[in-house]
Amino acid sequence: MATNAKPVYKRILLKLSGEALQGTEGFGIDASILDRMAQEIKELVELGIQVGVVIGGGNLFRGAGLAKAGMNRVVGDHMGMLATVMNGLAMRDALHRAYVNARLMSAIPLNGVCDSYSWAEAISLLRNNRVVLLSAGTGNPFFTTDSAACLRGIEIEADVVLKATKVDGVFTADPAKDPTATMYEQLTYSEVLEKELKVMDLAAFTLARDHKLPIRVFNMNKPGALRRVVMGEKEGTLITE
């Protein structure tokens, strides 16, 4: 397969789900997966790519589930946001151990734990090739971490949002349930909406569409997939205008 000599993106926003960090355990953080992801991010930095990362928190806490059981949704979402900060701390530690300069920012001020999110500071760090980990979602309840990824992607003027998942891309149906499901290589925003494909929640997706922010869905569990994506090779599903 032909490989471009240079990466096709200069600045990316990588969206990692909390589940991506839990490995086969089904809960918590798998240290070996964390270290592998840190190495893959390090490769991007060495290629000269500026990397922003938004991490979910579903491996530690899910607010929506407890909301159904009667917990106040705002309280549940605040707990979920704090779970993303815990994941961010773990990822920052893994990056530091891999000798990658990384800064953790939170949309909720947590003095003494990490920096508060500042758009200007994030841009400045990215320009200096620091990996910027963006935690606590948007800082508001009722918004998913996918919404946070698209919002931060637009704010930092990323070339693309790379949504790392457990499947190879966007399929015609759920590949786990339907063996005949096939993967799309490329889609437009309108096609995703027309076909009602589950890429991300509607608020997040329409935000990306309105700001013409491309989204690429790929499988982070495939070693080297992240590098192949940034080098412009066929990997995952690309969603653009």
UniProtKB/Swiss-Prot annotation:
It catalyses: UMP + ATP = UDP + ADP. Keywords: Allosteric enzyme, ATP-binding, Cytoplasm, Kinase, Nucleotide-binding, Pyrimidine biosynthesis, Transferase. It comes from the Bacteria. GO terms for cellular component: cytosol. Residues 23-28 are annotated as: Involved in allosteric activation by GTP. It is found in: Cytoplasm. The keyword Kinase applies. Pfam families: AA_kinase (PF00696). Allosterically activated by GTP. Inhibited by UTP. ATP binds at K15, L16, S17, G18, G58, R62, T165, F171, D174. UMP binds at G57, D77, T138, G139, N140, P141, F142, F143, T144, T145. GO terms for biological process: 'de novo' CTP biosynthetic process; UDP biosynthetic process. Pathway: Pyrimidine metabolism; CTP biosynthesis via de novo pathway; UDP from UMP (UMPK route): step 1/1. InterPro entries: AceGlu_kinase-like_sf, Asp/Glu/Uridylate_kinase, Uridylate_kinase, Uridylate_kinase_bac. Its EC number is 2.7.4.22. GO terms for molecular function: ATP binding; UMP kinase activity. Signal peptide: none annotated. It is an enzyme of class 2 (transferase). Belongs to the UMP kinase family. Catalyzes the reversible phosphorylation of UMP to UDP. Homohexamer. This is Uridylate kinase.
